[in-house]
Regions:
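Hydrophobic helical membrane-anchoring modules
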Residues: 1-7, 149, 173-237
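A conserved acidic beta->alpha catalytic loop
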Residues: 45-54, 100
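Donor nucleotide-sugar binding loop of glycosyltransferases
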Residues: 17-20, 48, 75
Length: 237
């Protein structure tokens, strides 16, 4: 195994989250410091058009934080970009979103389950979704089951711990511009028989700001993710 400097690199993609991003970063610093981990936080701003960028830049000189400001490419490509940086920094990579719908204080539950595993994937309990979003989630779960023999309960959750050595292998087959890379990663982990542990997490509706997806947008993006998943499945054994 490669000799890596850090225990974990936390990848947080962000776009137009001026009301939440500062609180999100502060919470992650608090949690990781309390666990005495050797860590790095990667904040990747995907070309925000509000005050998010200026808030993120304030953390540029903070110890254990890297801030990356890049042109807008979308959530998926931003996750992949973060993963590709993170695998060279730490033994484990953790991905979280910046909306605080899953509190960072739940990270320790996944971290303690990592021993002997290649990935620890959260699953959201009591998730209050609209009918349309519930349908999109169901289709994603069925598609990964059919294409990858994946039985994970929450294939697209942005609260996942991945061993860098394994993630590096998967990233070789997932396009840099992937629209929904986490779904493909969930499927590939299962298909290639890596050791996966699931961990329930509490999901909270966001209290400030707005979700970037309407029901119609969720349907369109769900369809796009499905076609991409079919294509990606062909490059895995």
């Amino acid at each position: 195994m490669r000799k890596l400097l850090k225990d974990v690199a936390v990848v947080i993609p962000v776009f137009n989250e001026e009301e939440l991003i500062g609180e999100c970063i502060d919470e992650w610093l608090k949690v990781l410091n309390s666990m005495n981990l050797h860590y790095e936080i990667l904040i990747i701003d995907d070309g925000s058009s509000d005050a998010t960028t200026s808030i993120v830049e304030r953390y540029g000189d903070t110890q254990n934080i890297q801030t990356i400001i890049k042109p807008n490419e979308g959530h998926g490509p931003t996750i992949v970009a973060g993963y590709k940086r993170a695998v060279d920094i730490a033994e484990w990579v953790f991905q979280a979103d910046s909306d605080n719908e899953i509190n960072p204080n739940q990270f320790s539950a996944l971290w303690t389950k990592r021993h002997g595993k290649d990935a620890v994937i959260g699953w959201r309990q009591d998730r209050n979704q609209t009918t349309v979003r519930r349908l999109v989630t169901y289709v994603a779960r069925v598609a990964t089951k059919v294409l990858f023999r994946c039985h994970l309960r929450d294939v697209n959750i942005p609260f996942r711990l991945l061993r860098s050595e394994i993630l590096t292998i998967l990233l070789e087959r997932i396009p840099s511009n992937a629209f929904a890379p986490n779904i493909a990663i969930s499927g590939a982990l299962s298909l290639m028989n890596y050791q996966i542990e699931e961990c329930p997490v509490v999901f909270n509706e966001r209290t400030v700001g707005e979700s970037s997806l309407s029901n119609l947008a969720a349907l369109r993006k769900g369809g796009r993710a499905l076609f991409e998943l079919i294509k990606i499945s062909r490059v895995f054994p």
